[in-house]
Amino acid sequence: MPKNAPVKRTAFNVSISIALRDRLRALSKSLGVKTSVLIDEAVMGLLAKYAEKGGIQLMSDGEARQTQHVICVASGKGGVGKTTTTAALAYLFSAIGKKKVLLIDADAQTNLTQLMKANIDGKRDIQGAIITRLVNPDIPINTFILPTQYKNIDIIPGNPFIEEVGFLSQIRKAKLDNDVNLWIEMMNAIKDIQEYDVIMMDTHPSSGLPTSYPLQACDYVIIPLEPDPSSVSGFKEVYKKIIQARKVMNPNIKLLGYFFNRVKANTGSAKQFIPTARETIPEVISEVNGGAEEGKFFDTVIRDSEDVRKAVILHSAVTERFRSNKVGKDFEKLYLEVTEALANG
């Protein structure tokens, strides 16, 4: 619409207090602005405020849509519980939050795909979803989305050769002088179908290229840690990748938070290390991020539990199979912290 085009108006009968009416008239007269314009601007401001608070997008067509959160679960080392965390939180987003969730298995080990019992066929997976953005973007992204055993959770299955996709992006950039990332194109295609409230990616356990590419296509990052010194160094490397992604391709990426996982609560090493790490890791963030703070060190500590290993064997989210047990309750506390952090942006 042209900038000075008249705004179409319609009758919308509401009652306001006499005091508010008098204030509107006085302000209108003082500013030389119609009361209808003042009301429009005031209502738009309130709509934006409460939409942001509720995580809702107000569309130009008048529809209100829930904001889509794209969350990467990343780590600089294996064995810290990325896949368990991704599945556990996804289930709780669905069960408690009543969200429609899409999982993306971006780890060549494809553990998340196996855990969620996706009926894989070797054709519809993440490699296909990304490569079609290059060779035939008209193929609907839904083609590569499969149901899981859970009603409101779908998945784009993993592929052991997912690392090759990164090299395709580099070749594309070299040949076409095109900086558009295939991961971003895939994510845009997913967002466009407007079917999912939460999109969660399980990434490769490293600080190299297999982790870098997914980070360029997500909004938030959650980092699980184990209570040992190597986790701090691994955290630093992953956080560097977040900063790099922010500078190169994804200016809006944020570290949502980080937490301790698989903690043997009664061991002296955990009791000594965790308080120290709660001071050390924020210092690492400040060092890498030019003095700025970022992300929440979640209060929740996920205790080590045999139930996690049982859930893996049973191909289940631990929060579904053992929700009433201690580890299930731990993850539920973490979920509440995560949703609060998302609400606060």
In which residue ranges do the predicted regions lie?
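P-loop NTP-binding core
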Residues: 2-12, 22-26, 30, 35-37, ...
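Short, structured motif recognition centered on aromatic/hydrophobic residues
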Residues: 16
